[in-house]
């Protein structure tokens, strides 16, 4: 058997990992500006945490979850999304307690798992950045969270992003619309895909979310949920639109957007961009005011979003965005002979302890090969260390571009490398 990674997974090698780290750091910095703190939840949860919150009839639960019984006969699932685990943690750790400052703002970065057909930007193990805000029903919370995602895209230089917006209203609004949608779709039931025929019985709003061509055709002229919003839902949605306009965030209303999870109410949104002629969703979320209560906590409003890191990085690459990643090394030590081995290790370690990036040769190669490595590492400074340098207690360090050089004692290198570097690079 050939030992390879499982289908739908990936190895993220150092060159790519640097891009991941950069995007993650920009996300962390952005979220901290909005007073969000990081939360880390287990990669696996009890099956019911996901099935009951995401929805028993959703594709995620019926087709895509990795679930199994462990050795204690507990039904476990690898998390397919981030919101339900965070809500479970919010309730379990009593973050709703009066002494905890509201709203509670949390973000997470981690792996999610779904059994689906692997394709570009969509894997079976994928990585998600997400945020959740608990305790505020104010529509300004919706807009601030959407604006935070928009702010992140601006910082990363992502272009041609369109905000798609809709409201699912209150449970009462949705119930009235549900019956209207059933009445509209039932006469064309046979024209729907098999999945959507099932959805029509179980959760007809899911038909609007279908990607199948025949389903898209069927719902093209479906009644709009916005016509069924009650007064409170309408006021909430109008406030969201007004505040988005006040922040100069353009949007389009998409009445067929329902999102792939059952827990949403009121505002839902997606950020969509075009890549090579195809529309791609890069971020999606919305309001969920009943989920905390569903997990046994007090009724608590919530709002959040998730975005896929793989897809985000693919879009960055396709749009030709160069991320400002530091790839240069401060100093490279070329080592000649066994007599310099110990001193080279001592020096390189002392230089690193002063805050510099440094590498040395460990393979006993010829000097030409070592200088080639220095160039590959984009080393700013290069030092050659052999038997004569060890005996003298000093060595020549040179600027790898200008070739300017200076002879420096080991003592100075080990205690004051900043001055040496400044002298050669200024």
Curated annotation (Swiss-Prot):
Record's keyword annotation contains tRNA processing: no
Classification via Gene3D superfamilies: Anticodon-binding domain, Bira Bifunctional Protein, Domain 2
Localization: Cytoplasm
Domain of life: Bacteria
EC number: 6.1.1.21
Keywords for the protein's UniProt record, in alphabetical order: Aminoacyl-tRNA synthetase, ATP-binding, Cytoplasm, Ligase, Nucleotide-binding, Protein biosynthesis
A cellular component annotation (GO) from this entry: cytoplasm
Catalytic activity: tRNA(His) + L-histidine + ATP = L-histidyl-tRNA(His) + AMP + diphosphate + H(+)
Assembly, per entry: Homodimer.
The protein, known as: Histidine--tRNA ligase
Species this chain originates from: Streptococcus pyogenes serotype M28 (strain MGAS6180)
């Amino acid at each position: 058997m050939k030992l390879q990674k499982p289908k739908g997974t990936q190895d993220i090698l150092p060159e790519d990992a640097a891009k991941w780290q950069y995007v993650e750091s920009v996300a962390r910095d952005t979220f901290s500006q909005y007073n969000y703190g990081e939360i880390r939840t287990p990669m696996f949860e009890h099956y019911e945490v996901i099935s009951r919150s995401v929805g028993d009839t959703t594709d995620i639960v019926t087709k895509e979850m990795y679930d199994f019984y462990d050795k204690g006969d507990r039904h476990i699932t690898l998390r397919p999304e981030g919101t339900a685990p965070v809500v479970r943690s919010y309730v379990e750790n009593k973050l709703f307690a009066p002494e905890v400052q509201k709203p509670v703002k949390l973000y997470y970065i981690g792996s999610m798992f779904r059994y689906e057909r692997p394709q570009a930007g969509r894997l079976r193990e994928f990585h998600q950045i997400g945020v959740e805000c608990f305790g505020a029903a104010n529509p300004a919370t919706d807009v601030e969270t959407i604006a935070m995602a928009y702010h992140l895209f601006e910082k990363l230089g992502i272009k041609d992003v369109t905000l798609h917006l809709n409201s699912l209203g209150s449970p009462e609004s949705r119930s009235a619309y549900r019956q209207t949608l059933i009445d509209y779709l039932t006469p064309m039931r046979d024209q729907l895909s098999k999945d959507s025929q099932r959805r029509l019985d179980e959760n007809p709003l899911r038909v609007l979310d279908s990607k199948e061509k025949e389903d898209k055709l069927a719902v093209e002229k479906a009644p709009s949920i916005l016509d069924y919003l009650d007064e409170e839902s309408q006021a909430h949605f109008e406030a969201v639109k007004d505040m988005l306009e006040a922040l100069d965030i353009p949007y389009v209303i998409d009445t067929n957007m329902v999102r792939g999870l059952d827990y949403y109410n009121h505002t839902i949104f997606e950020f969509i961009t075009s890549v090579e002629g195809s529309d791609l969703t890069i971020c999606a979320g919305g309001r969920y005011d009943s989920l905390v209560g569903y997990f046994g906590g007090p009724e608590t409003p919530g709002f959040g979003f998730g975005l896929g890191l793989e897809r985000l990085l693919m879009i960055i690459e396709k749009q030709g965005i160069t991320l400002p990643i530091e790839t240069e090394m401060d100093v490279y030590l070329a080592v000649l002979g066994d007599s310099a081995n110990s001193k080279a290790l001592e020096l390189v370690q002392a230089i690193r302890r002063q805050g510099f990036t440094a590498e040395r040769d460990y393979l006993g190669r010829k000097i030409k090969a070592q200088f080639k490595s220095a160039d590959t590492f984009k080393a700013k400074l290069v030092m050659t260390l052999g038997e004569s340098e060890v005996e003298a207690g000093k060595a020549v360090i040179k600027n790898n571009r200008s070739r300017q050089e200076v002879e420096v004692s080991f003592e100075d290198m080990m205690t004051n490398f900043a001055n040496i570097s400044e002298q050669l690079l200024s």
